[in-house]
A protein has these predicted regions:
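Fold-independent oxyanion-binding glycine-rich loops
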Residues: 92, 143-144, 172-173, 208-209, ...
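N-terminal glycine-rich phosphate-binding loop and ensuing alpha1 helix
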Residues: 2-167, 176, 185-203, 212-213, ...
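Conserved beta-loop-beta/alpha segment of the NTase-like Rossmann-fold superfamily
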Residues: 159-160, 164-263
Length: 336
């Protein structure tokens, strides 16, 4: 069935009745190109608007890291030296809130001299590769909006000294924007409103960009995913990699201790017994202020979007149906 024949999208058919033949040809072509399967989640109410039961989650804390640091680091360096670790930089955003009309990673954060956000992140990664004596494959996720500018920026700056053969770009997939009933928003008489498919879609975007074969050929078993925003983070951190391996986990998350109960940061926890994240606006006051016997916050492990995943596990769950995390956008409207 054509999308415009769906009862829930009947206004599209009404629009087509008003369009010119040329407009309809363009609109039909566009509608046939888009994957609308995401709408099934919305129509079936498969979203995370209603959360499960939260509970605190333990983490490897500083005292244990200090006690077992040498062990963790050696395990991590071994994995890196064996070519088993890759990194994915999520850099699809623009620097609009920073006053930039270009990719966020191109922000100059230098004081005495020019120092770009992308540059500092590459330096952080090279701190590790210099110690390990091998390069870590880096995959950079861009967006339709900033892909050309991002790739040109890296070319202009000679990849900040990182080997070009170890850097690959891929574009984040887009999904149709819709309302809470799954009705599609339109940008114009011929264009569907589209939005990025979220942080959770990075691996499927990689796969659909044909990069799974590259991961396989390189023998990568662990992927460190991190966001462009944090210029202080350690990338492919041997201690982080080693701790995850030592505990036999399929994934790991770097966290920072919350400074105060009302700090606006999501926290790592469990939800219905499974590891999860509760955003700060989803936490009750009771959750936010609950403390352990030693005075630490029970929900005190703030997430910084720096994760380590088993590549094998990612493949296993790549086609799994996940609930949609709804993000409201004020600038979306239908032209009908």
């Amino acid at each position: 069935m054509k999308i415009w024949e769906d009862d829930n999208q009947k206004y599209i058919k009404a629009m087509m009745e008003k369009n010119t033949t040329e407009q309809n040809e363009k609109l039909t072509k566009r509608l046939e190109e888009i994957d609308f399967s995401v709408l099934e989640h919305i129509e079936r109410k498969e979203t995370v608007n209603e959360r499960g039961v939260f509970a605190p989650l333990d983490a490897v804390e500083v005292s244990e890291i200090e006690a077992r640091g040498a062990e963790f680091k050696e395990l991590g360096l071994k994995a890196i030296r064996e070519g088993k670790v890759g990194a994915v930089l999520l850099a699809g955003g623009q620097g609009t809130r920073l006053g930039l009309d270009r990719p966020k990673g191109t922000l100059n954060i230098g004081v005495a001299k020019e120092l770009y956000l992308f540059e500092q992140l590459l330096r952080n990664l090279m701190d590790v590769t210099d110690e390990a004596g091998v390069y870590v494959p880096l995959y950079i996720m861009t967006s339709n909006i900033n892909n050309a500018d991002t790739t040109a920026f890296f070319e202009e700056h000679d990849y900040f000294g990182y080997p070009k053969d170890y850097v690959k770009f891929f574009v984040q997939e887009m999904v149709p924007a819709c309302d809470y009933e799954g009705r599609i928003y339109m940008e114009s008489q011929t264009e569907v409103a589209m939005s990025p498919n979220g942080n959770g879609g990075w691996f499927s975007s990689m796969v659909n960009a044909g990069l799974l074969s590259d991961i396989k050929e390189r023998g990568i078993e662990w992927i460190n995913v991190f966001a462009v925003d944090n210029c202080l983070q350690r990338i492919a951190d041997p201690m982080f990699v080693g701790a995850t391996i030592a505990y036999g986990c399929e994934s790991g998350a770097k966290v920072v201790r919350k400074a105060a109960p009302d700090e606006r940061v999501g926290v790592l926890c469990t939800e219905d017994g499974k590891p999860s994240i509760a955003e700060y606006y989803e936490m009750t006051e009771e959750m936010a202020t609950a403390r352990k016997e030693n005075g630490d916050l029970k929900y005190g492990f703030g997430v910084i979007l720096n994760y380590l995943f088993s590549e094998k596990k990612l493949e296993q769950i790549a086609d799994a149906r996940m609930p949609i995390h709804v993000v409201e956008k004020k600038d979306r409207k239908s032209v009908v």
